[in-house]
């Protein structure tokens, strides 16, 4: 079964491995076909289902520590918004939450250095252009980018503005 294919076409299901972001309604629909559910990339522990998710906390803190160890204190983020596959529920990006919390704890968080849009190269491009226009000489020295697609657009905007990576600004992207 892929994406929005109908589960009703299946006569017998022993278990389901569901990949993606799912709303509570979608989880309940899947439960009707099999109690043996495992979710990948969707935290469903609070709904009583096993799941496999990325340890964003470790990844984000590792990246931020890398920047901090280099003496970089002005760190920005280009993030994206996600939603469930049925489009009914917005999902907070755990990378962004961790980024804000970690830098706030160190009294280094600058809201003006954070931009949020869609997970696309075009969005990365537009968000970085906005940051360049708004910050001018006050640009962060490093950026944590929440996806490779966003990073592609970010790099294009930096290149167009004559900002050299990694000489002027460092970036690390993590999907």
How should these model regions be labeled?
Residues 1-3, 52-62, 78-129, 145-152, ...:
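Hinge/beta->alpha junction and helix N-cap segments in small-molecule ligand-binding domains
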Residues 10-19, 76-79, 114, 136-147, ...:
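Periplasmic-binding protein-like
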